[in-house]
Curated annotation (Swiss-Prot):
Disulfide bonds: none annotated. This is Probable transaldolase. Pathway: Carbohydrate degradation; pentose phosphate pathway; D-glyceraldehyde 3-phosphate and beta-D-fructose 6-phosphate from D-ribose 5-phosphate and D-xylulose 5-phosphate (non-oxidative stage): step 2/3. It is found in: Cytoplasm. The active site is at K92 (schiff-base intermediate with substrate). GO terms for cellular component: cytoplasm. Its EC number is 2.2.1.2. One of its GO terms (biological process) is carbohydrate metabolic process. Belongs to the transaldolase family. Type 3B subfamily. Transaldolase is important for the balance of metabolites in the pentose-phosphate pathway.
Length: 223
Protein backbone atom coordinates (compact mmCIF):
# COMPACT_ATOMS: atom_id res chain seq x y z
CA UNK A 1 0.00 0.00 0.00
CA UNK A 2 1.33 3.40 -0.99
CA UNK A 3 1.36 6.27 1.49
CA UNK A 4 0.17 9.76 0.52
CA UNK A 5 0.18 13.00 2.49
CA UNK A 6 -3.09 14.93 2.66
CA UNK A 7 -1.83 18.50 2.76
CA UNK A 8 -0.98 21.55 0.69
CA UNK A 9 1.96 22.55 2.92
CA UNK A 10 5.31 22.38 1.14
CA UNK A 11 7.09 22.25 4.48
CA UNK A 12 5.15 19.17 5.56
CA UNK A 13 5.66 17.51 2.18
CA UNK A 14 9.41 18.15 2.22
CA UNK A 15 9.72 16.72 5.73
CA UNK A 16 7.91 13.46 4.96
CA UNK A 17 9.43 13.12 1.47
CA UNK A 18 12.87 13.08 3.12
CA UNK A 19 11.90 9.81 4.86
CA UNK A 20 11.83 8.08 1.47
CA UNK A 21 8.33 6.61 1.93
CA UNK A 22 6.04 9.22 0.34
CA UNK A 23 4.41 8.22 -2.96
CA UNK A 24 1.98 11.08 -3.56
CA UNK A 25 -0.07 13.99 -2.21
CA UNK A 26 -3.76 14.83 -2.04
CA UNK A 27 -5.01 18.38 -1.64
CA UNK A 28 -8.36 20.12 -1.51
CA UNK A 29 -9.49 23.76 -1.64
CA UNK A 30 -9.62 24.02 2.16
CA UNK A 31 -6.02 22.86 2.57
CA UNK A 32 -4.78 25.22 -0.15
CA UNK A 33 -6.68 28.18 1.32
CA UNK A 34 -5.16 27.53 4.75
CA UNK A 35 -1.62 27.58 3.35
CA UNK A 36 -2.11 30.88 1.54
CA UNK A 37 -3.91 32.43 4.51
CA UNK A 38 -1.05 31.43 6.82
CA UNK A 39 1.43 33.10 4.47
CA UNK A 40 -0.76 36.17 4.07
CA UNK A 41 -0.63 35.80 0.29
CA UNK A 42 -3.39 36.27 -2.24
CA UNK A 43 -4.62 33.01 -3.79
CA UNK A 44 -4.34 34.01 -7.44
CA UNK A 45 -4.53 31.51 -10.30
CA UNK A 46 -0.82 32.05 -11.03
CA UNK A 47 0.20 31.59 -7.39
CA UNK A 48 -1.92 28.45 -7.10
CA UNK A 49 -0.37 26.95 -10.23
CA UNK A 50 3.14 27.74 -9.01
CA UNK A 51 2.35 26.14 -5.66
CA UNK A 52 1.06 22.96 -7.31
CA UNK A 53 4.16 22.74 -9.50
CA UNK A 54 6.36 23.04 -6.43
CA UNK A 55 4.44 20.22 -4.73
CA UNK A 56 4.81 18.00 -7.81
CA UNK A 57 8.53 18.65 -8.03
CA UNK A 58 8.94 17.83 -4.34
CA UNK A 59 6.99 14.57 -4.17
CA UNK A 60 7.68 13.10 -7.60
CA UNK A 61 4.36 11.20 -7.64
CA UNK A 62 0.65 11.82 -8.24
CA UNK A 63 -0.76 15.05 -6.78
CA UNK A 64 -4.54 15.33 -6.55
CA UNK A 65 -5.87 18.86 -7.07
CA UNK A 66 -9.59 19.45 -6.60
CA UNK A 67 -11.94 21.54 -8.72
CA UNK A 68 -14.20 24.12 -7.12
CA UNK A 69 -16.83 24.18 -9.88
CA UNK A 70 -20.14 22.39 -9.34
CA UNK A 71 -21.41 21.93 -12.91
CA UNK A 72 -19.93 19.42 -15.35
CA UNK A 73 -18.96 21.88 -18.08
CA UNK A 74 -17.13 24.11 -15.62
CA UNK A 75 -15.54 21.08 -13.92
CA UNK A 76 -14.16 19.90 -17.26
CA UNK A 77 -12.71 23.32 -18.06
CA UNK A 78 -11.15 23.64 -14.60
CA UNK A 79 -9.90 20.05 -14.74
CA UNK A 80 -8.13 20.71 -18.02
CA UNK A 81 -6.45 23.79 -16.55
CA UNK A 82 -5.30 21.82 -13.52
CA UNK A 83 -3.97 18.93 -15.61
CA UNK A 84 -2.02 21.36 -17.78
CA UNK A 85 -0.08 22.65 -14.77
CA UNK A 86 2.03 19.50 -14.41
CA UNK A 87 1.97 15.90 -15.74
CA UNK A 88 1.69 14.55 -12.17
CA UNK A 89 -1.61 16.32 -11.50
CA UNK A 90 -4.66 14.14 -10.89
CA UNK A 91 -7.95 16.03 -11.13
CA UNK A 92 -10.12 15.56 -8.06
CA UNK A 93 -13.89 15.62 -8.59
CA UNK A 94 -16.84 15.22 -6.21
CA UNK A 95 -18.93 12.08 -6.61
CA UNK A 96 -22.09 13.76 -7.85
CA UNK A 97 -24.07 13.55 -11.09
CA UNK A 98 -22.12 16.49 -12.48
CA UNK A 99 -18.87 14.99 -11.22
CA UNK A 100 -19.56 11.71 -13.03
CA UNK A 101 -20.25 13.56 -16.28
CA UNK A 102 -17.00 15.50 -15.94
CA UNK A 103 -15.08 12.35 -15.01
CA UNK A 104 -16.23 10.57 -18.16
CA UNK A 105 -15.11 13.42 -20.37
CA UNK A 106 -11.79 14.10 -18.67
CA UNK A 107 -10.81 10.43 -18.49
CA UNK A 108 -11.66 10.07 -22.20
CA UNK A 109 -9.08 12.81 -22.82
CA UNK A 110 -6.44 10.85 -20.91
CA UNK A 111 -6.65 13.01 -17.78
CA UNK A 112 -6.49 11.02 -14.56
CA UNK A 113 -9.38 11.60 -12.16
CA UNK A 114 -9.71 10.97 -8.43
CA UNK A 115 -13.38 10.77 -7.43
CA UNK A 116 -13.70 12.00 -3.87
CA UNK A 117 -16.35 12.20 -1.14
CA UNK A 118 -17.29 8.54 -1.55
CA UNK A 119 -19.43 7.08 1.22
CA UNK A 120 -20.88 3.95 -0.40
CA UNK A 121 -19.77 1.04 -2.57
CA UNK A 122 -22.34 2.05 -5.18
CA UNK A 123 -20.77 5.49 -5.47
CA UNK A 124 -17.39 3.84 -5.99
CA UNK A 125 -18.86 1.58 -8.68
CA UNK A 126 -20.34 4.54 -10.53
CA UNK A 127 -17.04 6.43 -10.31
CA UNK A 128 -15.12 3.46 -11.67
CA UNK A 129 -17.58 3.02 -14.56
CA UNK A 130 -17.19 6.72 -15.37
CA UNK A 131 -13.48 6.14 -15.92
CA UNK A 132 -11.96 7.30 -12.64
CA UNK A 133 -8.35 6.30 -12.01
CA UNK A 134 -8.87 6.58 -8.24
CA UNK A 135 -11.80 6.40 -5.82
CA UNK A 136 -11.52 7.93 -2.35
CA UNK A 137 -13.81 6.50 0.36
CA UNK A 138 -13.81 8.60 3.55
CA UNK A 139 -13.20 6.32 6.54
CA UNK A 140 -13.20 8.90 9.32
CA UNK A 141 -16.33 10.73 8.25
CA UNK A 142 -18.20 7.43 7.98
CA UNK A 143 -17.06 6.51 11.49
CA UNK A 144 -18.25 9.94 12.68
CA UNK A 145 -21.87 9.05 11.93
CA UNK A 146 -21.58 5.70 13.75
CA UNK A 147 -21.19 3.65 10.59
CA UNK A 148 -18.13 1.49 9.93
CA UNK A 149 -15.52 3.09 7.69
CA UNK A 150 -13.53 -0.13 7.62
CA UNK A 151 -16.54 -2.11 6.41
CA UNK A 152 -17.12 0.45 3.66
CA UNK A 153 -13.51 0.11 2.55
CA UNK A 154 -13.74 -3.69 2.61
CA UNK A 155 -16.85 -3.63 0.40
CA UNK A 156 -15.25 -1.29 -2.12
CA UNK A 157 -11.97 -3.21 -2.34
CA UNK A 158 -13.77 -6.54 -2.71
CA UNK A 159 -16.18 -5.15 -5.30
CA UNK A 160 -13.36 -3.75 -7.42
CA UNK A 161 -11.49 -7.05 -7.27
CA UNK A 162 -14.58 -9.12 -8.14
CA UNK A 163 -15.54 -6.81 -10.99
CA UNK A 164 -11.91 -6.46 -12.15
CA UNK A 165 -12.22 -2.69 -12.42
CA UNK A 166 -9.11 -0.68 -13.42
CA UNK A 167 -9.27 1.77 -10.52
CA UNK A 168 -7.18 2.30 -7.38
CA UNK A 169 -8.69 2.77 -3.93
CA UNK A 170 -7.42 5.66 -1.81
CA UNK A 171 -8.40 5.32 1.85
CA UNK A 172 -9.10 8.93 2.84
CA UNK A 173 -10.34 10.87 5.86
CA UNK A 174 -7.81 9.00 7.99
CA UNK A 175 -7.87 10.18 11.60
CA UNK A 176 -5.34 7.96 13.38
CA UNK A 177 -2.68 5.27 12.78
CA UNK A 178 -5.18 2.44 13.28
CA UNK A 179 -7.01 3.63 10.17
CA UNK A 180 -3.76 3.18 8.23
CA UNK A 181 -3.26 -0.36 9.53
CA UNK A 182 -6.88 -1.17 8.75
CA UNK A 183 -6.56 0.20 5.21
CA UNK A 184 -3.45 -1.91 4.57
CA UNK A 185 -5.08 -5.08 5.92
CA UNK A 186 -8.23 -4.51 3.86
CA UNK A 187 -6.32 -4.13 0.62
CA UNK A 188 -6.46 -0.41 -0.13
CA UNK A 189 -3.99 0.63 -2.81
CA UNK A 190 -3.22 3.93 -1.10
CA UNK A 191 -3.79 5.61 2.25
CA UNK A 192 -3.69 9.40 2.38
CA UNK A 193 -3.36 11.07 5.74
CA UNK A 194 -2.60 14.38 7.49
CA UNK A 195 0.95 15.23 8.52
CA UNK A 196 0.21 14.57 12.20
CA UNK A 197 -1.00 11.03 11.51
CA UNK A 198 2.01 10.34 9.27
CA UNK A 199 4.30 11.33 12.15
CA UNK A 200 2.34 9.13 14.56
CA UNK A 201 2.99 6.06 12.38
CA UNK A 202 6.61 6.15 13.47
CA UNK A 203 6.07 6.77 17.15
CA UNK A 204 6.05 4.07 19.82
CA UNK A 205 7.13 4.51 23.45
CA UNK A 206 8.97 1.18 23.50
CA UNK A 207 11.13 2.31 20.56
CA UNK A 208 12.19 5.41 22.50
CA UNK A 209 12.78 3.40 25.68
CA UNK A 210 14.79 0.78 23.81
CA UNK A 211 16.97 3.37 22.08
CA UNK A 212 17.63 5.15 25.37
CA UNK A 213 18.64 1.87 27.00
CA UNK A 214 20.98 0.91 24.15
CA UNK A 215 22.74 4.26 24.37
CA UNK A 216 23.04 4.07 28.15
CA UNK A 217 24.53 0.57 27.92
CA UNK A 218 26.97 1.73 25.26
CA UNK A 219 28.12 4.66 27.40
CA UNK A 220 28.95 2.21 30.19
CA UNK A 221 31.33 0.08 28.12
CA UNK A 222 32.74 2.31 25.40
CA UNK A 223 36.48 3.09 25.65
Amino acid sequence: MELYLDTASLEEIREIAAWGVLSGVTTNPTLVAKVFAAKGEALTEEAFAAHLRAICETVGGPVSAEVTALEAEAMVAEGRRLAAIHPQIVVKLPTTEEGLKACKRLSAEGIRVNMTLIFSANQALLAARAGASYVSPFLGRVDDISWDGGELLREIVEMIQVQDLPVKVIAASIRHPRHVTEAALLGADIATMPHAVFKQLLKHPLTDIGLKRFLEDWEKVKP
